[in-house]
Structures are given as structure tokens and as C-alpha cells.
């Protein structure tokens, strides 16, 4: 199974692609989509959309996992994040890919074992789990890889449950 994880952000959106074969995880790609501060917000959304579609077309993931919204105290930031998430989900759906969503707590719990882990802890664990020679250049990229790992763990658990039930 090939999974693409997306960590949406209007300034920097992380994306990562991981293959899972015979319970082994192998990183295929990771990167950050950085928008320009002078771009209007709609231009940023279009840029993020176009870049995500290009990654989807290049690496052809079977499924895409997107980080769900966290609690935000700033309404304007929450709205922008929601719109950026919408663009990420739309890029997947328009390319015919199924989408799963996970909260930051679920991702951290799955990857680090602690739902309130710091970004550095997530990055360190992603680097270890994927046996990377170097850490991803941004927390957005390592978070995206963590989201993909979380989805692989969830999909594997769901498959085991279905197999045990005989469905």
C-alpha cells in the first residue's frame, strides 16, 4: 500500500509518501509546499492545490491521509486552515483517491505513543521508524510522514479486525 500524508498549512503544507510492503515502511518522498507571503490567499490555495495534484500524479498513492483540525483560539487562522484542508481533500478526491482524516492527537499517539508529543519528538520518531539518514527539513514534512504512518497503522489494524471477524 502506498499512502500520502498531508499536513495542511496556508504558509507551508507538508506532504510525504510512504510504501508499506510486508509490514515494512519505506519512504518514497517528502517535501514542503511553501507559499509566498506576497501572494493573495486565493493564489496560495491554488498554488497548494496545483502542487499537491502534481505530487499525487507523480507518486500515485493508493490512499491519502490528511490531518484534521486542531482546536484553534484564533478564528481567522482556523478558517484559513479549514480552507487549506479543503484544498488538500479536493486535490485527493479530484484525482480519485480515498481520503482519511486524523486528529493531531491520533497521529502523535500512533507514531510516538503519546498524544501530546512535541513536534521535535514526532520528527525524531519519524526519522527512526523510516530509518532516514537525515531528518526532514521542516516539521511540516515530518508531520506529513507521521500522518501517513498513522494511516498505515490504522489500515493494518482495521484489516486484522476484518480478518478476525471473517468479513
Language model features: what each stretch is:
Residues 1-167:
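Phosphate- and other anionic-substrate recognition elements at nucleic-acid/protein interfaces
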Amino acid at each position: 500500500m502506498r499512502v500520502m500524508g498531508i499536513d495542511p498549512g496556508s504558509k507551508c503544507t507538508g506532504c510525504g509518501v510512504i510504501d508499506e510492503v510486508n509490514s515494512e515502511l519505506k519512504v518514497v518522498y517528502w517535501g514542503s509546499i511553501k507559499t509566498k507571503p506576497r501572494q493573495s490567499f486565493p493564489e496560495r490555495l491554488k498554488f497548494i492545490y496545483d502542487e499537491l495534484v502534481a505530487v499525487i500524479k507523480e507518486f500515485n498513492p493508493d490512499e491519502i491521509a490528511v490531518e484534521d483540525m486542531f482546536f484553534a483560539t484564533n478564528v481567522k487562522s482556523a478558517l484559513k486552515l479549514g480552507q487549506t484542508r479543503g484544498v488538500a481533500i479536493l486535490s485527493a478526491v479530484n484525482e480519485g483517491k480515498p481520503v482519511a482524516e486524523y486528529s493531531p492527537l491520533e497521529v502523535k499517539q500512533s507514531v510516538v505513543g503519546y498524544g501530546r508529543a512535541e513536534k521535535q519528538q514526532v520528527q525524531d520518531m519519524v526519522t527512526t521508524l523510516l530509518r532516514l539518514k537525515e531528518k526532514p527539513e521542516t516539521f511540516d514534512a515530518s508531520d506529513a510522514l507521521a500522518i501517513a504512518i498513522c494511516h498505515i497503522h490504522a489500515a493494518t489494524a482495521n484489516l486484522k479486525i476484518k480478518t478476525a471477524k471473517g468479513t
